[in-house]
């Protein structure tokens, strides 16, 4: 917590000194603490500060009657520069967690903020999205980028995260949107590896790996069953070697992974086949774990923000305030 406070002190304060009761970092810390305890919205956080004023006054050495109010919290959330807050978070997360032993498989994915949607029914539609770099093993977010829909794309921000990332010898995982030659080239340049989904957005590659998996013998195979959460799923994972002349411009492509899934939930059954490309040369069992782990970014990050913190239901629709809220 002390390292976070030191970083919060570096966030630029937009307020004038006259009439200012609290340093910006104290207001931000109160917002973080309240959010962690399930308070959302300006008024709820104002109530949190009021109800816990004696504890907060002791921790932050402020007068109990002068803990940050609803109006102060609202003003700060709408006024603090999201770029300064974002820079602070990214520096803090990498310094605090970047050297941990359980930071190896890094999922990358975007999440839109539904509460910021403007003009949903015409060409002027706009909203805020955040792209996160998420550790599968630890459940920690290591880097985030913010996009305004009309001014950027998830692909561009994903590539920017890879360029900014100073970690090496890690494995980036991503969905088919990020099966881009430039993205994969940047991963290779950063001295990291990848496991990326392939779908029809890369038609030639998709057809080639289908042909490869149908005409070649897998070098590794793994079968697994999953009977949890009221569903039954069987998975068959096969790994195929890729020659250098078969890479089609995807740098360091060494293996194709084919995953066949068969399952049922209640009375409904389904079958599907998915394909992945990778620079790794692991066994089918290891690839199975990495591929399953990628979806933790959905159920351990995006789900938590939506269901626990009710991000999409938030009444905060102002782009600046909503961006700051999502970062914190």
Question: What function would you assign to each model-found segment?
Answer:
Residues 2-4, 17-174, 179-182:
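Conserved, well-structured functional cores that handle cations and Mg-NTP chemistry
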Residues 24, 293-328:
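Basic, amphipathic alpha-helical segments enriched in Lys/Arg and hydrophobic/aromatic residues
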Residues 30, 109, 194, 298, ...:
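A residue-level signal for conserved active-site and pocket-lining positions in enzyme catalytic cores
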Residues 88-91, 103, 221-224, 301-307:
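Short coil/turn segments at secondary-structure boundaries
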Residues 125-129, 181-199:
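A short alpha/beta connector and helix-capping loop motif
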Residues 196-293:
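An anionic, glycine-rich sequence signature occurring as long contiguous blocks
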